[in-house]
């Protein structure tokens, strides 16, 4: 796990975009894993800028969303299908048919979850997965207590997560109680994971998952077992890390040829 401490969101967005651009140069038909929430927005903004100004090409890319609310129609403005479309995919030249989402409106939820797992596998797996992290250490919607080997499934949202997400809705009562989410085992199958965290409110979660024990109480801690994880944090989110000086030193001392 590589921890990179940066001044702010702009620098985080640029560095994550560098990694994605390098991937697309090597592999134009790469498979991206897309997250929602505020954390990946600087990355999407920077990728859209590079597409518009420098022609960064997404025409052969496939993308898989991490999660989707259960019970929201696909066109609902806060469905993750619509959020990802507005915030990213409509701003680049990725084919709409190449952007995949769990089907939160399916009549047969278990079958929809298995179909999503099958689609990821058929695409060759995710090359690079973007993640944020919740204040309780959740990734995707794998809340505390989630199985570290879990696959795509339905999950109930805890009240803290519903409160965190209420800012995207009229009020907390409009936030659904259930989601479909890629499991921790599904996320761990991605070849490269980039997790982004900003702000002091994420500092404890960052410390817990980077430097704490691997345990279901902090779902993101499973990433300690992944062979290629990059953690991009601002100074505020890094403020509780005991080894912050070490992380700064190792990043500053990296060979110029070594990317993320």
UniProtKB/Swiss-Prot annotation:
Coiled-coil region: none
Catalytic reaction annotation: alpha-D-glucosamine 6-phosphate + H2O = beta-D-fructose 6-phosphate + NH4(+)
Q: Which SUPFAM superfamilies has this protein been placed in?
A: NagB/RpiA/CoA transferase-like
* Listed pathway(s): Amino-sugar metabolism; N-acetylneuraminate degradation; D-fructose 6-phosphate from N-acetylneuraminate: step 5/5
Under which EC number(s) is this enzyme classified? Answer: 3.5.99.6
This protein's GO CC annotations = cytoplasm
Q: Which domain of life is it from?
A: Bacteria
What are this entry's molecular-function GO terms? Answer: glucosamine-6-phosphate deaminase activity; identical protein binding
Q: Which residues are catalytic?
A: 67 (proton acceptor), 136 (for ring-opening step), 138 (proton acceptor), 143 (for ring-opening step)
Arranged from A to Z, the UniProt key words for this protein are: Carbohydrate metabolism, Hydrolase
Give the family per the record.
Answer: Belongs to the glucosamine/galactosamine-6-phosphate isomerase family. NagB subfamily.
Task: Identify the NCBIfam families for this entry.
Answer: nagB, PRK00443.1-4
Q: What is this protein called?
A: Glucosamine-6-phosphate deaminase
Q: Which organism is it from?
A: Arthrobacter sp. (strain FB24)
């Amino acid at each position: 796990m590589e921890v990179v401490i940066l001044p702010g969101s702009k620098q985080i967005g640029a560095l994550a975009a560098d990694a994605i651009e390098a991937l697309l140069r090597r592999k134009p038909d790469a498979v991206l894993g897309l997250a929602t929430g505020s954390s990946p927005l600087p990355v999407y903004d920077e990728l859209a800028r590079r597409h518009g100004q420098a022609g960064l090409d997404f025409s052969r890319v496939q993308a898989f969303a991490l999660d989707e609310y259960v019970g929201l129609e696909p066109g609902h403005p806060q469905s993750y299908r619509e959020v990802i479309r507005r915030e990213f995919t409509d701003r680049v030249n990725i084919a709409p048919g190449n952007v995949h989402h769990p089907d939160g409106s399916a009549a047969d939820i278990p079958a929809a979850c298995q179909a999503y797992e099958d689609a990821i596998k058929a695409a060759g797996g995710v090359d690079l997965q973007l993640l944020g992290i919740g204040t309780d250490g959740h990734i995707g919607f794998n809340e505390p207590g989630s199985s570290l080997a879990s696959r795509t499934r339905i999950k109930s949202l805890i009240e803290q997560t519903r409160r965190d997400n209420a800012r995207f809705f009229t009020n907390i009562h409009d936030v659904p109680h259930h989601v479909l989410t890629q499991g921790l085992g599904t996320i761990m199958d991605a070849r490269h994971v980039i997790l982004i965290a900003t702000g002091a409110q994420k500092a404890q979660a960052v410390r817990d998952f980077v430097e704490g024990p691997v345990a279901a109480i902090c779902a993101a801690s499973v990433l300690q077992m992944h062979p290629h994880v990059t953690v991009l944090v601002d100074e505020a989110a890094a403020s509780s890390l005991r080894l912050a000086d070490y992380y700064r030193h190792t990043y500053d001392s990296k060979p110029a040829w070594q990317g993320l």
